[in-house]
Amino acid sequence: MQDFIKINKDDNVAVALKPIAKGTTLNVAGIDVTTVEDIPQGHKFVIKAIKIGDPVIKYGFRIGFAQADIPVGAWVHTHNLKTGLGELLEYTYEPEGHKDVEPTEPAYFDGYMRENGKVGVRNEVWIVPTVGCVNSIARAIEATARANKPEGVDEVVAFTHPYGCSQTTEDQENTRKILADLINHPNAGAVLVLGLGCENSRIEVLKDYIGEVNPDRVKFLQVQDVENEQEEAEKLMNELMAYAATFKREKVNAKELIIGMKCGGSDGLSGITANPTVGLFSDMLVSKGGTTILTEVPEMFGAETILMNRCANKELFEKTVHLINDFKEYFIKNGQEIYENPSPGNKDGGITTLEDKSLGCTQKSGSSLVKGVLAYAEPVNTKGLNLLSAPGNDLVAATACAASGAQMVLFTTGRGTPFASPVPTVKIATNSRLAGNKGNWIDFNAGRIVTDDLPLEDAAKELFQLVLDVASGKKVKAEIAGFHDLAIFKQGVTL
């Protein structure tokens, strides 16, 4: 196991891969560096003296400016490093030197072919409430249906939420779009849409967003219109489960996979282990004709030009500029400083500034060209790497990936989290300590890249196989625990 890593040849800091004691002498690229204080795991230390006001370089890019003279061997963190991010910026499209990944041999998994041509990796029956007022009824329906679930139906899930009424303008529109996206999701073999009757987003309104449906697959129940909603729901659920049970897994080309990519509870190893592993995975899937979705726009701030210059054309570049600046304007409108993002857990794990976090976060995008830029709740329609507008919040962003069509989400974490999303959510640990302590949460240990000297390419191949296995029916830890979460982006007034 290495003591440290210098990520890029131009960096003036290195990252401790394990705790390094004060007075330890390390050979960094042929130069002896002696630490002048203890360096925690995942944190940065200086390998070339940095003067006050000079940039601190990591990943080959600036992550902020020194707030004091920092000698060789010193710890670099919030006490002596400050962000260099500002407000809205002007950007220039500079695509030279970027090319897409080369096509590779196809891969396959066992999935569910739907009548509309989409492919699911689960065959579940979903209950989608139009409004939070019927959440308790939805959960009761879920419990009854689970007790009667036939063979061939993976699970019955009620996706409760607090919205659907007392919302205005964009919030109400977003709720309707997200619910419609879920109703049309291929992981759902069948869906019961459960309404109250007097809400803003009542069933008749929502139908305009859902579009044409197969009445065997999607059924509607407005509970104010019936005498006994439980009896009516049980009848409808039995019909829906019988329909869903007719689908069987069959061999499907991996080009049909759409995988969301998200990180949360990041630490100083996120950009060294788990995120680059996911990035290589993304390149592998794209090379086989598949699709990946990168979101959490605020965690692109400071690294956005990397993604902009990888846009396949000028139109996508302009869309990415709007993606970034629209989110910055959202922050400004609400009086939030753009750069105040790293959480206490991020900082404890070694991430200092938003640039530091973002440069690690965008490692998940790999090296392929950006082929699509999506608005929040917009379904993906272009194969390859897509950027999706959504905030950094774990539940909101992961739900957004699912709503845009992801059949699965890859979630990297250095601190750990038990949450789930509407689709299988693969938890990838950045460090082996987390993987060992939280084996009931973690599905893949990318920390072995550090502790076991596992080559990054081998880790990515293992992850690719795990994704195929999960797509073929293997349950992730959150599914085993029975976790299924949903969160919708809220920005405005609640009436």
What are these regions (language model features)?
Residues M1-M408, R415-P418, V423-L495:
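Metallocofactor- and cofactor-centric catalytic cores in central/energy metabolism, strongly enriched
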